[in-house]
Amino acid sequence: MSDTRIDFLYLNEKDMIDAGVLDAGHCVETMEEVLCLLAKGDVLMGGKNRREHGIQLIFPKESEIPGFPLEDSRDRRFMSMPAYLGGRFHLAGEKFYGSNGRNVRKGLPRSILMATLNNVETGQPLAYMSANLLSAMRTGAVPGVVAKHLSVKNPKVLTLLGPGVVNKTCLMAYMSQFNSIDTIKIKGSSAASATAKEMERFIKEKYPQVSH
């Protein structure tokens, strides 16, 4: 009888950090490799055209069914985003997230993301992972790749438009590529905002060598 056990890694957010998800330099290297595979066409996304971003669960605005979920708050949705990545990876995977604007009142992120990796031949799950940090680092790594190839040589000044979470991971990606940066400038709506203060704290803690 064949072995039918299905074993996979479960990685919570701490596990992901321990595994190196916050290693911005490695994220930039990986995304550079992924973009090369994309350019070669060694990828698949959803749909017949193989380029669908994903499929979204859309809630109705009203329902006669008691307790039925409704589109009654900002950004309320579920989204499934399957893909195949070739090259040395040769894996199928999916990012799945649920989002609800009311989450903030509960002390939760607006969107909560998970990622699954599967054997592309058998469909066996290989890993089920917390993906909020993973997705954020991926987002920041892409402009990191662009800056790596298109920036002036040995840049001294980095300017960020906005102090939010995405620009925090962009900052990490840029700093992983350029140890010449000694000044960080940020343009935001208010220097007194919570996000601006958090960015200031982050820069002082992680990059004490720069002025801002």
Language-model region placement:
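N-terminal ligand-binding/catalytic initiation module
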Residues: 1-138, 142-144, 154
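Short, surface-exposed alpha-helical segments at coil->helix boundaries
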Residues: 112, 168, 193-197
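Glycine-rich adenosine-cofactor-binding loop
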Residues: 143, 154-178, 187-191
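Short acidic-hydrophobic, aromatic-tinged amphipathic segments that line or gate anion-handling sites
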Residues: 211-212
